[in-house]
Amino acid sequence: MEELRTLPEYLKASNADGTVILQATATWCSQCKAIAPFVEKLVKQFPEAKFYKYDTDSAGDIAQELGVSQMPVFTIFQNGDLEETVTGARGKALEETIRKVYKGEVRQGDGE
């Protein structure tokens, strides 16, 4: 998963065509680490979606732009429009939310 480090990188990624999922994370965030394997499954399950992460400590301007105050937070864009936000390490909720927005091929995955 590519890491966004600057506000211009975020703007380019979030305005891309298709489905874009941004994950707010931090090195000290235990829930972020706990959900990481599940997110990797989602990357494979939704191959046409673009997944990015950003560290709220080193890329605080991105977190501020999105109003992130807790983690993990997943912000889902479709064709440049912010569609949904999922807060917390809630794998099933994240998967269901991506399914609502995503328009591409879905590969079979067992979710959790």
Regions found by a protein language model. Name each.
Residues 9-10, 62:
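Short alpha-helical segment
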Residues 76-111:
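Non-catalytic, surface beta->alpha helical segment in thiol-disulfide oxidoreductase systems
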Residues 1, 111-112:
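N-terminal targeting signals for export/organelle localization
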Residues 4-5, 24, 36-61, 68:
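Thiol-based oxidoreductase modules, predominantly thioredoxin-like and allied folds used
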Residues 66-75:
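Structural micro-motif
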Residues 17-20, 47-50, 70, 82:
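Core residues of folded domains in eukaryotic genome-function proteins
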Residues 3, 11-41:
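Local sequence-structure signature of Cys/Sec-based thiol-disulfide redox active-site neighborhoods
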